[in-house]
């Protein structure tokens, strides 16, 4: 059996895009056990995907000591492949302990953050990323060296908790579209005028907006069609 570890601690948008690689891993390896290490508050999102065999929850309150203990436990799993989809100090510490030697198992792949391009875009407004930029593709590219090149997107067996299903089963309809207009970096956000135009272009659909309590601009999006747009900014959680 092949054992595969994915490292991605946060944030919600990146984790959801990274989840797109799971189908490709399972297609490439007939008998595979997939583990994922993430931040404690992201476990609820990943737990909805039944294709992940084990989720490791890192509590950042435990600091370096907690990370080192988790690294020691991960090393005992004897992984064949490790995919560092985060590339930060924490993930580098994990790799150093779990996979200390190059060119031997566990083999390691790294997703580049393309820091030079990020600096130019976020600080100087100069965009050298692919146009259009697709974050999901950036998570897929590093896996090509392992022969993982096809990523099925037909998974529908999401494991929503019963209380979530019962709470929203009458709220969600086939003509509903969910909008998630926020981002930590303002430059990553689509302009509000574009969201309002999208709502206007689809008069046959209802919309629900999901965002954080500080995203007050969502109310302006709702104003495009108050009878069809529900603003739940600040009223929901990750699970």
Residue ranges and their predicted role:
Residues 1-239:
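Catalytic machinery of carbohydrate-active enzymes
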């Amino acid at each position: 059996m092949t054992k595969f570890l994915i490292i991605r601690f946060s944030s919600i948008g990146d984790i959801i895009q990274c989840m797109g690689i799971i189908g490709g891993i399972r297609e490439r390896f007939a008998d595979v056990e997939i583990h994922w290490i993430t931040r404690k508050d992201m476990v609820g999102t990943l737990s909805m995907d039944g294709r992940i065999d084990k989720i490791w929850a890192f509590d950042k309150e435990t600091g370096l000591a907690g990370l080192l203990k988790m690294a020691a436990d991960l090393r005992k799993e004897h992984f064949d492949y490790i995919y560092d989809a985060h590339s930060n100090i924490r993930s580098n510490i994990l790799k150093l302990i779990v996979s200390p030697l190059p060119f031997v198992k566990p083999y390691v792949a790294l997703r580049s953050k393309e820091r030079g391009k990020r600096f130019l875009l976020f600080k100087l407004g100069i965009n050298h990323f692919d146009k259009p930029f697709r974050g999901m593709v950036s998570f897929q590219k590093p896996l090509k060296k392992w022969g993982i090149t096809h990523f099925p997107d037909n998974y529908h067996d999401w494991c929503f908790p019963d209380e979530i299903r019962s709470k929203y089963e009458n709220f969600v309809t086939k003509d509903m579209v969910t909008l998630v207009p926020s981002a930590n970096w303002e430059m990553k956000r689509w302009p509000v005028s574009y969201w309002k135009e999208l709502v206007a272009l689809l008069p046959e659909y209802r919309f629900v907006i999901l965002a954080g309590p500080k995203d007050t601009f969502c109310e302006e999006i709702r104003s495009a069609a108050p009878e069809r747009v529900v603003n739940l900014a600040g009223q929901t959680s990750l699970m």
